[in-house]
């Protein structure tokens, strides 16, 4: 498949570049439902600023140098019809970042279904999951414990997981803390 070819080619060049930079190469899959703020969060970390985004049809890919890691982050669209394509991005993934719109209580069952689907994928077996509870700056945002309960995350026993509250628009602090968790858990593998 053409997407596999490009994924393998990107991985090859990332590995070549890492030999010169001395940074550990990692592949991060950033997914979540549409409108959760994935692209905004990615570009806030990459550029340090808010950029105007449109719904992602397909994917965005960026390399982020963070601590001792060179992270290739694949931000894949979250519209319902696109989610069936997520499986094409699983190969070689070292960590998953699932971005949740903390204000969208009505879609938490849908989020849970998607996370449950990820957990049973053989290619993602044991892969850690960071859940960014985005849009914490909004008055009606669910807090971390509400997200954990709503998604039944305490039942996950076969991998590391962590929920990090953040606001991609208001403050980078939660974003950095989340990526710290990813970096630390990848380095301690």
Curated annotation (Swiss-Prot):
Cellular localisation: Golgi apparatus
Question: Which Gene Ontology cellular-component terms appear in the entry?
Answer: cytoplasm; Golgi apparatus; plasma membrane
Q: State one molecular function term (GO).
A: GTP binding
Q: Which InterPro entries match?
A: P-loop_NTPase (IPR027417), Small_GTP-bd (IPR005225), Small_GTPase_ARF (IPR024156), Small_GTPase_ARF/SAR (IPR006689)
Claim: Transferase is one of the keywords in the record: no
Q: Does the keyword Transmembrane helix apply?
A: no
Its GO biological process annotations read: intracellular protein transport; vesicle-mediated transport
Keyword annotations for this protein, in alphabetical order, are: ER-Golgi transport, Golgi apparatus, GTP-binding, Nucleotide-binding, Protein transport, Transport
Signal peptide annotation = none
Q: Give me the residues that bind GTP, please.
A: 34-40, 75-79, 134-137
Q: Output the NCBIfam families linked to this UniProt entry.
A: small_GTP (TIGR00231)
Q: What PANTHER family does the record point to? A: ADP RIBOSYLATION FACTOR-RELATED
Query: What's this chain's function?
Result: GTP-binding protein that may be involved in protein trafficking. May modulate vesicle budding and uncoating within the Golgi apparatus.
Family membership noted in the UniProt record: Belongs to the small GTPase superfamily. Arf family.
Q: What is this protein called?
A: ADP-ribosylation factor H
Q: Which organism is it from?
A: Dictyostelium discoideum
Gene from which the chain derives: arrH
């Amino acid at each position: 498949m053409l997407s596999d070819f490009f994924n393998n080619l990107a991985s090859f060049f990332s590995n070549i570049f890492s030999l010169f930079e001395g940074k550990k190469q990692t592949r991060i899959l950033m997914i979540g439902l549409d409108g959760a703020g994935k692209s905004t969060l990615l570009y806030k970390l990459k550029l340090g600023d808010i950029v105007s985004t449109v719904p992602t049809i397909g994917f965005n890919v960026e390399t982020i140098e963070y601590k001792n890691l060179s992270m290739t982050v694949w931000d894949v669209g979250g519209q319902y019809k696109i989610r069936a394509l997520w499986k094409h991005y699983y190969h070689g993934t070292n960590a998953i970042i699932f971005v949740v719109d903390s204000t969208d209580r009505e879609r938490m069952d849908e989020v849970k279904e998607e996370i449950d689907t990820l957990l049973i994928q053989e290619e993602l077996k044991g892969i850690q999951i960071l859940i960014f509870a985005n849009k914490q700056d909004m008055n009606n945002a669910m807090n971390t414990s509400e997200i954990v309960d709503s998604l039944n995350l305490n039942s996950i026993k076969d991998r590391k997981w962590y929920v990090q509250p953040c606001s991609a628009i208001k403050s980078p602090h939660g974003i950095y803390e989340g990526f710290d968790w990813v970096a630390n858990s990848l380095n301690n593998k």
